[in-house]
A protein has these predicted regions:
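A contiguous active-site-proximal alpha/beta segment in oxidoreductase catalytic domains
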Residues: 1-35
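Glycine- and charged-residue-rich phosphate/anionic-cofactor binding loop of Rossmann-like
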Residues: 145-149, 167-185
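Short arginine-rich
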Residues: 189-200
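Residue-level signal for the nucleotide or nucleotide-sugar donor/cofactor binding architecture
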Residues: 4, 48, 155, 178-181
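Short glycine-enriched, charge-decorated loop/helix-capping segments at active-site entrances
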Residues: 40-44
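Contiguous beta-strand/loop segments that form the cofactor/metal-binding neighborhood of enzyme cores
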Residues: 48, 52-136, 151, 158-173, ...
């Protein structure tokens, strides 16, 4: 929520440049943490990582989830799904789809990823892509067209700490800060979407041997996605 690109897009929406907000599309697929590396204590990937995108979709919609349908895959025959896509509606009629998985070319010679936010209105669009170093925001409104390129900014923990400190000093919570309720709802709905996926066909594709190869490769990688650093 503290990212410059999300706030730029939200401001553009507030200006009426895309008309009425209609569709929110969020995707985050990387060859990141593999099963067994460090997710289990927080659940499958869609909860540990995907809950952030559940939150950002709800933040854009400014409404609560109403309906949903989820499809997942048990990649490499692992016990839990490591890729999930959910689509549905919010109470205000806005439609969403969220795609998340750390299954994106784990054994590719040169790894890559696919991450974006795509906001579609009745008149225009706003979208963002990034490569974890640089973020590109493209705004196509009824009176404005912009292409903004700035440093990605990571998780912006420094901004979060700054807002929190200012809230303590002033005795008033910054409206830019999420509430505990927001975190609880993001977690709750990530679990709900996972449970919904388990009620549908949940195919297992691939073999555990491939997962073993992935873990071994990641264990020896010097530069990769979401590598766990071991300190002596």
């Amino acid at each position: 929520r503290n990212s410059w690109y999300h706030n730029t897009i939200k401001d553009f929406i507030a200006q009426g440049e895309i008309g009425e907000l209609a569709i929110i599309r969020v995707c985050h697929m990387t060859p990141g943490l593999a099963p067994g590396e460090g997710h289990e204590y927080e659940g499958p990937a869609f909860h540990d990582c995907g809950m952030h995108y559940v939150d950002i979709a709800r933040w854009y919609a400014q409404s609560e989830f109403k309906t949903w349908n989820a499809q997942a895959v048990r990649m490499w025959n692992y016990k839990d799904p490591w890729w999930l896509q959910c689509h549905g509606t919010f109470e205000n009629g806005v439609v969403f789809d969220i795609t998340q998985g750390h299954v994106y070319g784990q054994l590719a010679q040169t790894q890559t990823h696919n991450s974006y936010v795509d906001i579609i209105g009745t008149k225009g669009i706003a979208r963002m892509t990034h490569d974890f170093k640089t973020a590109i925001v493209e705004l196509h409104g009824v009176t404005q067209t912009h292409r903004l390129i700035q440093p990605y900014g990571g998780k912006n923990i420094d901004t979060l700490c700054k807002l929190f400190a200012e809230s303590i000093e002033t005795g008033r919570r910054s409206e830019a800060l999420p509430e505990f309720r927001d975190a609880a709802l993001a977690s709750e709905y990530a679990w709900r979407f996972l449970r919904d996926a388990r009620e549908h066909d949940l195919p297992a594709i691939g073999e555990l041997e491939t997962l073993r190869q992935i873990r071994e490769r990641r264990r020896t990688m010097k530069d990769g996605y979401g590598l766990l650093r071991k300190h002596a």
